[in-house]
């Protein structure tokens, strides 16, 4: 595909919101607040921000550079920039990672739809804490209901993708992201109005530098890496739709700020509500689907209508956060098939959706009726999570650093960062230093930590 034929995002704000939508996901809500509250509050946030700017942004800019300069999807970008070399496998790695993640991530995304329905039917009312445990375990192991929601969620994602870059991805981002922001701000306001909310606020934001140690730095580095959707090709694919006027540095900064802003606000929803009823939240799916429904019912027990509204809004928020992520993951694979095999966009999208439904169905069933079928003592859901999050993404991020930092000509990076010399790049040498030396070491440490070796 020639550069002149490639569709670009129609506006700068559309590009920023699309990239931010790729970064904002369920991890912002179920992992970041827990990490922050248990690792020094504001002290962790400061360490995390340092990691975002010293680790996350250099890699993000590197991925943006690859995407815009090649004007190709992640799967083809490295063939364009390094023809006749083995670097093409880095592009294929990103496509495969995106495909596998979309397959099992859509299972969890589908759960949010079940909980929107459950909340909307007032199904959380009058339940005891143990009832939420039983309800979630029963639902997640059900051989039918999760599959229905999985298919619905993937079809919603498919609908956006087949509309194309401008009419699908950009338009949806301009709607979904503002709605997400409004929902999260309203929910924060409700949560902070609860009795004893200040205890949760203190737990989340009061700096405790005595807790800052090596583990905290590793946790902050890992959170920054995974939260910003690095290493999976989403950002470089979106960057291939950036216009020449898009400022890569400013866009990366905007994405980092928005992603962190959403994560902190998620904490301001969860902790004040939880502490108002004397519950200390955990992390992961159990936080979202077991702990929080119980918290919301108890926190607003005096005004049941508020418990109802709060619960519905919260799960709509989760679904929107998941959808912006599944759209970007789907686009990585669809764009590759569209360009590499000259398929129509619609046919490429159908292949991706169908393939992910198959992966999603098996992943979902591996939590229930097929849980006895394992590989390396893991069902498919847990195996895909392990292989992608702990191996493929860190490896992809590391190779991006090496490719842009060492293989690609510095003049290419300079040209992209300065928009052909039109912008100043006073921090260019620092960017190259971080990309060549700091980010690779950090990723190797993340890789080792995720594998449980340190």
Predicted regions and their residues:
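Select transmembrane alpha-helical segments in multipass membrane proteins
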Residues: 8-19, 44-47, 86-99, 148-153, ...
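Inter-helical loop and helix-membrane interface segments of multi-pass membrane transporters/permeases
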Residues: 3-7, 35-39, 69-93, 106-162, ...
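Membrane-interface "cap" regions at the ends of multi-pass membrane proteins
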Residues: 1-30, 59-64, 68-81, 85-92, ...
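A generic transmembrane alpha-helix motif of multi-pass inner-membrane proteins
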Residues: 379-402, 424-454
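Extracellular loop-to-transmembrane helix junctions
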Residues: 36-62, 145-146, 392-396
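Transmembrane helix-boundary motif of multi-pass solute transporters/channels
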Residues: 11-51, 199, 239, 250-253, ...
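Membrane-embedded translocation segments of transport machinery
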Residues: 2-5, 9, 170, 174-323, ...
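Loop-to-transmembrane helix boundary motifs in multi-pass membrane proteins
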Residues: 8, 13-14, 22, 147-148, ...
């Amino acid at each position: 595909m020639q550069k002149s034929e490639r569709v670009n995002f129609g506006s700068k704000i559309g590009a920023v919101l699309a990239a931010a939508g790729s970064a904002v996901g369920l991890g912002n809500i179920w992992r970041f607040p827990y990490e922050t509250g248990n690792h020094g509050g504001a002290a962790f946030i400061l360490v995390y921000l340092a990691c975002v700017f010293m680790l996350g942004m250099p890699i993000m800019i590197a991925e943006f550079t690859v995407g815009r300069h090649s004007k190709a999807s992640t799967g083809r970008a490295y063939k364009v920039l390094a023809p006749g070399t083995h670097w093409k496998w880095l592009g294929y790695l990103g496509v495969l990672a995106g495909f596998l993640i979309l397959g099992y991530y859509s299972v969890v995304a589908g759960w949010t739809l079940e909980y929107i329905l459950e909340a909307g039917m007032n199904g959380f009312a009058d339940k005891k804490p143990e009832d939420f445990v039983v309800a979630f375990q029963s639902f997640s192991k059900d051989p039918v209901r999760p599959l229905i929601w999985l298919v619905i969620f993937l079809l919603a994602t498919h609908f956006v993708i087949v509309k194309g870059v401008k009419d699908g991805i950009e338009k949806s981002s301009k709607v979904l992201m503002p709605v997400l922001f409004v929902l999260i701000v309203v929910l924060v306001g409700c949560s902070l109005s609860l009795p004893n909310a200040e205890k949760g606020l203190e737990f989340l934001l009061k700096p405790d530098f005595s807790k800052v140690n090596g583990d905290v730095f590793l946790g902050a580095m890992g959170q920054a890496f995974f939260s910003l959707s690095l290493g999976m090709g989403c950002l470089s694919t979106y960057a291939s739709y950036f216009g020449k006027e898009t400022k890569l540095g400013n866009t990366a900064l905007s994405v980092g700020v928005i992603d962190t802003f959403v994560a902190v606000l998620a904490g301001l929803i969860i902790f004040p509500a939880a502490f108002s009823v004397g519950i200390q939240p955990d992390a992961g799916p159990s936080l979202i689907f077991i702990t929080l429904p119980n918290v919301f019912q108890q926190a607003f027990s005096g005004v049941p209508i508020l418990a109802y509204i709060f619960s519905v809004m919260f799960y709509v928020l989760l679904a929107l956060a998941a959808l912006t992520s599944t759209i970007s993951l789907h686009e990585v694979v669809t764009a590759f098939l569209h360009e590499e095999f000259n398929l129509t966009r619609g046919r490429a999208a159908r292949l991706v959706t169908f393939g992910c439904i198959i992966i999603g169905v098996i992943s979902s069933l591996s939590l229930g009726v097929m849980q006895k079928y394992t590989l390396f003592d893991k069902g498919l859901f847990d195996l895909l999570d392990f292989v992608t999050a702990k191996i493929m993404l860190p490896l992809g991020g590391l190779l991006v650093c090496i490719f842009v930092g060492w293989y690609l000509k510095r003049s290419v990076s300079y040209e992209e960062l300065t928009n052909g010399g039109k912008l100043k790049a006073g921090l260019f040498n620092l960017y190259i230093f971080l990309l060549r030396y700091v980010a690779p070491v950090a990723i190797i440490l993340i890789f080792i930590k995720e594998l449980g070796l340190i």
